[in-house]
Amino acid sequence: MDKDLKIAFFDSGIGGLSVLAEALRRFSGAEFLYFADEDHVPYGTKSRAQIVRLSLDAVGFLVSRGADAVVVACNTATSAAISELRGAFSVPVIGMEPAVKLAADSFGARPTLLIATPLTIAGEKLARLVGRLECETWSLPLPCLVEFAQDLEFDSPAVRAYLQGELAKFELERLGSLVLGCTHFNYFKDVLREILPSHVRIIDGIDGTLNRLASELGGGLKLACGEDFSELACKFDAEELDAGGGQNARGKSRQCEGSDESARSEQGKKGGDEQGAEEYDGNSGKIYYPNGNSVEYFYSGRALDAAQLHKIEVFLKRLDAMREIN
Protein backbone atom coordinates (compact mmCIF):
# COMPACT_ATOMS: atom_id res chain seq x y z
CA MET A 1 0.00 0.00 0.00
CA ASP A 2 1.16 3.52 -0.68
CA LYS A 3 0.42 4.81 2.79
CA ASP A 4 0.46 3.46 6.30
CA LEU A 5 -2.91 2.20 7.42
CA LYS A 6 -4.64 4.24 10.09
CA ILE A 7 -6.39 1.88 12.49
CA ALA A 8 -8.57 3.11 15.33
CA PHE A 9 -9.34 1.44 18.65
CA PHE A 10 -12.35 2.51 20.70
CA ASP A 11 -13.25 1.60 24.28
CA SER A 12 -15.28 3.07 27.09
CA GLY A 13 -11.99 3.60 28.93
CA ILE A 14 -8.55 2.03 29.19
CA GLY A 15 -9.57 -1.62 28.77
CA GLY A 16 -9.02 -1.49 25.02
CA LEU A 17 -5.36 -0.67 25.59
CA SER A 18 -4.94 -4.44 26.01
CA VAL A 19 -5.89 -4.88 22.35
CA LEU A 20 -3.83 -1.90 21.19
CA ALA A 21 -0.78 -3.15 23.11
CA GLU A 22 -0.90 -6.47 21.29
CA ALA A 23 -1.33 -4.70 17.95
CA LEU A 24 1.77 -2.61 18.67
CA ARG A 25 3.75 -5.82 19.10
CA ARG A 26 2.37 -7.70 16.12
CA PHE A 27 2.18 -5.08 13.42
CA SER A 28 4.65 -2.67 11.86
CA GLY A 29 4.38 0.63 10.02
CA ALA A 30 0.84 1.42 11.14
CA GLU A 31 -0.76 4.59 12.45
CA PHE A 32 -3.07 3.91 15.38
CA LEU A 33 -5.74 6.05 17.00
CA TYR A 34 -7.03 5.25 20.48
CA PHE A 35 -10.29 6.71 21.80
CA ALA A 36 -11.17 6.22 25.47
CA ASP A 37 -14.59 7.61 26.35
CA GLU A 38 -13.42 8.74 29.76
CA ASP A 39 -16.32 11.18 30.10
CA HIS A 40 -18.82 8.31 30.12
CA VAL A 41 -17.01 5.26 31.50
CA PRO A 42 -18.25 2.71 32.53
CA TYR A 43 -20.55 1.50 29.76
CA GLY A 44 -21.52 -1.77 31.41
CA THR A 45 -24.18 -0.24 33.65
CA LYS A 46 -25.73 2.04 30.98
CA SER A 47 -28.76 1.33 28.81
CA ARG A 48 -28.35 -0.08 25.33
CA ALA A 49 -29.69 3.16 23.80
CA GLN A 50 -27.09 5.21 25.67
CA ILE A 51 -24.26 2.94 24.54
CA VAL A 52 -25.39 3.06 20.91
CA ARG A 53 -25.41 6.86 20.96
CA LEU A 54 -22.01 7.12 22.64
CA SER A 55 -20.49 4.52 20.32
CA LEU A 56 -21.76 6.28 17.20
CA ASP A 57 -20.24 9.54 18.44
CA ALA A 58 -16.89 7.89 19.20
CA VAL A 59 -16.57 6.01 15.93
CA GLY A 60 -17.75 9.06 14.00
CA PHE A 61 -14.91 11.03 15.56
CA LEU A 62 -12.37 8.36 14.62
CA VAL A 63 -13.60 8.14 11.04
CA SER A 64 -13.34 11.93 10.79
CA ARG A 65 -9.68 11.54 11.80
CA GLY A 66 -9.08 9.28 8.81
CA ALA A 67 -9.46 5.80 10.30
CA ASP A 68 -9.30 3.06 7.65
CA ALA A 69 -10.77 0.55 10.12
CA VAL A 70 -12.17 0.72 13.64
CA VAL A 71 -11.76 -1.93 16.32
CA VAL A 72 -14.47 -1.70 18.97
CA ALA A 73 -12.13 -2.90 21.73
CA CYS A 74 -15.00 -3.05 24.19
CA ASN A 75 -17.15 -6.13 24.68
CA THR A 76 -20.03 -4.06 26.04
CA ALA A 77 -20.10 -1.65 23.08
CA THR A 78 -19.84 -4.60 20.69
CA SER A 79 -22.79 -6.32 22.33
CA ALA A 80 -24.94 -3.20 22.35
CA ALA A 81 -23.99 -1.29 19.22
CA ILE A 82 -22.02 -3.28 16.64
CA SER A 83 -24.93 -3.58 14.18
CA GLU A 84 -25.65 0.16 14.32
CA LEU A 85 -21.97 0.98 13.87
CA ARG A 86 -21.60 -1.21 10.81
CA GLY A 87 -24.74 0.30 9.34
CA ALA A 88 -23.56 3.86 9.90
CA PHE A 89 -19.99 3.71 8.58
CA SER A 90 -18.39 2.42 5.38
CA VAL A 91 -15.04 1.47 6.96
CA PRO A 92 -14.63 -2.01 8.47
CA VAL A 93 -15.81 -2.13 12.08
CA ILE A 94 -14.45 -5.10 14.05
CA GLY A 95 -15.96 -6.06 17.38
CA MET A 96 -14.79 -7.92 20.47
CA GLU A 97 -16.65 -11.03 21.45
CA PRO A 98 -15.91 -13.28 24.44
CA ALA A 99 -13.78 -16.25 23.38
CA VAL A 100 -16.26 -18.79 24.72
CA LYS A 101 -16.12 -20.89 21.55
CA LEU A 102 -12.35 -21.14 21.81
CA ALA A 103 -12.74 -22.14 25.46
CA ALA A 104 -15.38 -24.73 24.60
CA ASP A 105 -13.30 -26.20 21.79
CA SER A 106 -10.23 -26.42 24.01
CA PHE A 107 -11.71 -27.38 27.38
CA GLY A 108 -15.27 -28.45 26.58
CA ALA A 109 -15.23 -31.44 28.90
CA ARG A 110 -15.34 -28.99 31.80
CA PRO A 111 -17.55 -25.91 32.32
CA THR A 112 -16.44 -22.46 31.19
CA LEU A 113 -16.90 -19.41 33.42
CA LEU A 114 -17.39 -16.12 31.58
CA ILE A 115 -16.79 -12.91 33.51
CA ALA A 116 -18.05 -9.70 31.90
CA THR A 117 -20.17 -6.59 32.45
CA PRO A 118 -23.89 -6.95 33.21
CA LEU A 119 -24.91 -5.70 29.77
CA THR A 120 -22.66 -8.14 27.91
CA ILE A 121 -23.97 -11.07 29.94
CA ALA A 122 -27.59 -10.03 29.38
CA GLY A 123 -27.09 -9.40 25.65
CA GLU A 124 -28.79 -11.37 22.89
CA LYS A 125 -25.55 -11.78 20.95
CA LEU A 126 -23.90 -13.65 23.80
CA ALA A 127 -27.01 -15.78 24.30
CA ARG A 128 -26.91 -16.83 20.64
CA LEU A 129 -23.20 -17.58 20.80
CA VAL A 130 -23.45 -19.65 23.98
CA GLY A 131 -26.54 -21.40 22.64
CA ARG A 132 -24.48 -22.88 19.81
CA LEU A 133 -21.95 -24.44 22.17
CA GLU A 134 -22.05 -27.99 23.43
CA CYS A 135 -20.44 -27.32 26.78
CA GLU A 136 -21.67 -25.93 30.08
CA THR A 137 -21.11 -22.16 30.34
CA TRP A 138 -21.52 -20.14 33.52
CA SER A 139 -21.50 -16.34 33.67
CA LEU A 140 -20.60 -13.80 36.33
CA PRO A 141 -21.03 -10.01 36.06
CA LEU A 142 -18.13 -8.09 37.61
CA PRO A 143 -18.92 -4.38 37.05
CA CYS A 144 -16.65 -3.16 39.85
CA LEU A 145 -13.53 -4.43 38.05
CA VAL A 146 -13.94 -1.75 35.40
CA GLU A 147 -13.82 1.00 38.01
CA PHE A 148 -10.90 -0.63 39.81
CA ALA A 149 -8.95 -0.68 36.54
CA GLN A 150 -9.78 2.92 35.68
CA ASP A 151 -8.45 3.94 39.11
CA LEU A 152 -5.15 2.04 38.67
CA GLU A 153 -6.19 -0.30 41.49
CA PHE A 154 -5.08 -3.70 40.26
CA ASP A 155 -4.09 -5.92 43.19
CA SER A 156 -5.24 -4.08 46.30
CA PRO A 157 -6.91 -5.84 49.25
CA ALA A 158 -10.24 -4.48 47.99
CA VAL A 159 -9.72 -6.04 44.55
CA ARG A 160 -8.71 -9.37 46.05
CA ALA A 161 -11.66 -9.42 48.44
CA TYR A 162 -14.07 -8.55 45.63
CA LEU A 163 -12.80 -11.27 43.30
CA GLN A 164 -12.54 -13.90 46.02
CA GLY A 165 -16.07 -13.18 47.18
CA GLU A 166 -17.59 -13.27 43.69
CA LEU A 167 -15.69 -16.34 42.48
CA ALA A 168 -16.56 -18.21 45.68
CA LYS A 169 -20.09 -18.53 44.27
CA PHE A 170 -18.83 -21.22 41.87
CA GLU A 171 -17.24 -24.67 42.11
CA LEU A 172 -13.93 -23.53 40.68
CA GLU A 173 -12.39 -27.01 40.72
CA ARG A 174 -14.92 -28.07 38.09
CA LEU A 175 -13.87 -25.38 35.63
CA GLY A 176 -11.73 -25.87 32.57
CA SER A 177 -11.38 -22.21 31.66
CA LEU A 178 -12.22 -18.66 32.68
CA VAL A 179 -13.04 -16.30 29.80
CA LEU A 180 -12.37 -12.58 30.15
CA GLY A 181 -15.43 -10.98 28.56
CA CYS A 182 -14.32 -7.40 29.16
CA THR A 183 -11.04 -5.87 27.99
CA HIS A 184 -10.66 -4.10 31.35
CA PHE A 185 -10.28 -7.49 33.02
CA ASN A 186 -6.86 -8.14 31.45
CA TYR A 187 -5.33 -5.94 34.16
CA PHE A 188 -6.27 -8.51 36.83
CA LYS A 189 -4.81 -11.71 35.42
CA ASP A 190 -2.31 -12.12 38.25
CA VAL A 191 -4.97 -11.89 40.97
CA LEU A 192 -7.28 -14.21 39.06
CA ARG A 193 -4.43 -16.67 38.58
CA GLU A 194 -3.82 -16.75 42.34
CA ILE A 195 -7.49 -17.46 43.11
CA LEU A 196 -8.20 -20.02 40.39
CA PRO A 197 -7.10 -23.66 40.58
CA SER A 198 -3.90 -24.22 38.62
CA HIS A 199 -5.60 -26.29 35.90
CA VAL A 200 -8.05 -23.51 34.94
CA ARG A 201 -6.94 -21.62 31.83
CA ILE A 202 -7.50 -17.84 31.53
CA ILE A 203 -8.58 -16.90 27.99
CA ASP A 204 -9.27 -13.54 26.31
CA GLY A 205 -10.47 -12.64 22.82
CA ILE A 206 -7.58 -10.43 21.71
CA ASP A 207 -5.95 -12.88 19.29
CA GLY A 208 -9.20 -13.55 17.45
CA THR A 209 -9.97 -9.83 17.19
CA LEU A 210 -6.59 -9.00 15.65
CA ASN A 211 -6.93 -11.94 13.26
CA ARG A 212 -10.25 -10.54 12.10
CA LEU A 213 -8.73 -7.08 11.71
CA ALA A 214 -5.98 -8.45 9.47
CA SER A 215 -8.49 -10.44 7.45
CA GLU A 216 -10.69 -7.38 6.91
CA LEU A 217 -7.77 -5.33 5.63
CA GLY A 218 -6.72 -7.98 3.13
CA GLY A 219 -2.93 -7.85 3.32
CA GLY A 220 -2.57 -4.22 4.32
CA LEU A 221 -1.10 -5.11 7.71
CA LYS A 222 2.43 -6.39 8.13
CA LEU A 223 3.81 -8.36 11.02
CA ALA A 224 6.62 -6.82 13.01
CA CYS A 225 8.84 -9.64 11.74
CA GLY A 226 8.02 -8.70 8.15
CA GLU A 227 5.41 -11.35 7.30
CA ASP A 228 1.95 -10.72 5.92
CA PHE A 229 -0.34 -11.20 8.89
CA SER A 230 -3.36 -11.73 6.68
CA GLU A 231 -1.94 -15.11 5.69
CA LEU A 232 -2.33 -16.19 9.30
CA ALA A 233 -5.85 -14.82 9.73
CA CYS A 234 -8.69 -17.29 10.21
CA LYS A 235 -11.59 -16.92 7.77
CA PHE A 236 -15.06 -18.33 8.32
CA ASP A 237 -18.20 -18.47 6.19
CA ALA A 238 -20.86 -15.78 6.43
CA GLU A 239 -23.29 -17.97 8.33
CA GLU A 240 -20.82 -18.25 11.20
CA LEU A 241 -20.65 -14.49 11.64
CA ASP A 242 -21.73 -13.10 15.01
CA ALA A 243 -20.87 -10.13 17.21
CA GLY A 244 -17.14 -10.31 16.65
CA GLY A 245 -17.18 -10.74 12.87
CA GLY A 246 -17.11 -8.03 10.28
CA GLN A 247 -17.62 -7.00 6.67
CA ASN A 248 -14.65 -6.51 4.40
CA ALA A 249 -14.56 -3.97 1.61
CA ARG A 250 -16.10 -6.45 -0.85
CA GLY A 251 -18.94 -7.29 1.54
CA LYS A 252 -17.88 -10.87 2.27
CA SER A 253 -18.27 -11.79 5.93
CA ARG A 254 -15.29 -13.19 7.76
CA GLN A 255 -14.75 -14.23 11.32
CA CYS A 256 -12.20 -15.91 13.51
CA GLU A 257 -13.50 -16.87 16.91
CA GLY A 258 -10.04 -17.36 18.30
CA SER A 259 -6.52 -18.46 17.50
CA ASP A 260 -3.77 -20.47 19.06
CA GLU A 261 -2.53 -18.29 21.90
CA SER A 262 0.99 -19.60 21.38
CA ALA A 263 1.06 -17.19 18.45
CA ARG A 264 0.92 -14.33 20.94
CA SER A 265 4.01 -15.55 22.71
CA GLU A 266 5.83 -16.09 19.41
CA GLN A 267 4.93 -12.67 18.07
CA GLY A 268 6.06 -11.12 21.33
CA LYS A 269 9.51 -12.57 20.76
CA LYS A 270 9.67 -11.40 17.15
CA GLY A 271 8.03 -8.04 17.64
CA GLY A 272 9.89 -7.00 20.74
CA ASP A 273 9.14 -7.17 24.42
CA GLU A 274 7.63 -4.24 26.32
CA GLN A 275 6.20 -1.71 23.90
CA GLY A 276 7.39 1.44 25.62
CA ALA A 277 7.10 4.77 23.85
CA GLU A 278 10.23 5.88 22.02
CA GLU A 279 9.37 9.44 21.03
CA TYR A 280 6.63 12.03 21.41
CA ASP A 281 5.92 14.53 18.64
CA GLY A 282 4.44 17.61 20.27
CA ASN A 283 3.31 19.05 16.94
CA SER A 284 1.30 16.06 15.74
CA GLY A 285 0.43 14.64 19.15
CA LYS A 286 1.72 11.24 18.07
CA ILE A 287 3.68 8.86 20.24
CA TYR A 288 6.11 6.69 18.30
CA TYR A 289 6.69 3.08 19.30
CA PRO A 290 9.01 0.30 18.10
CA ASN A 291 8.26 -1.41 14.76
CA GLY A 292 7.51 1.93 13.08
CA ASN A 293 4.09 2.31 14.72
CA SER A 294 2.58 5.51 16.08
CA VAL A 295 -0.44 6.25 18.27
CA GLU A 296 -2.60 9.31 18.82
CA TYR A 297 -4.57 9.08 22.06
CA PHE A 298 -7.88 10.80 22.78
CA TYR A 299 -10.10 11.02 25.84
CA SER A 300 -13.66 11.57 24.58
CA GLY A 301 -12.30 13.45 21.56
CA ARG A 302 -9.66 15.50 23.41
CA ALA A 303 -5.93 15.06 22.90
CA LEU A 304 -4.10 13.96 26.03
CA ASP A 305 -1.77 16.16 28.06
CA ALA A 306 1.62 15.03 29.39
CA ALA A 307 0.25 13.70 32.69
CA GLN A 308 -2.44 11.69 30.92
CA LEU A 309 0.08 10.25 28.47
CA HIS A 310 2.26 9.20 31.40
CA LYS A 311 -0.74 7.40 32.88
CA ILE A 312 -1.23 5.56 29.58
CA GLU A 313 2.33 4.27 29.84
CA VAL A 314 1.58 3.01 33.36
CA PHE A 315 -1.39 1.07 32.02
CA LEU A 316 0.69 -0.37 29.17
CA LYS A 317 3.40 -1.51 31.58
CA ARG A 318 0.80 -3.27 33.70
CA LEU A 319 -0.56 -5.03 30.63
CA ASP A 320 2.93 -6.09 29.63
CA ALA A 321 3.34 -7.75 33.03
CA MET A 322 0.00 -9.57 32.60
CA ARG A 323 0.56 -10.67 29.01
CA GLU A 324 1.92 -14.18 29.51
CA ILE A 325 -0.38 -15.12 32.39
CA ASN A 326 -2.92 -17.71 31.34
List where the protein language model places each region:
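Non-catalytic structural scaffold of enzyme domains
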Residues: M1-D260, R264-N326
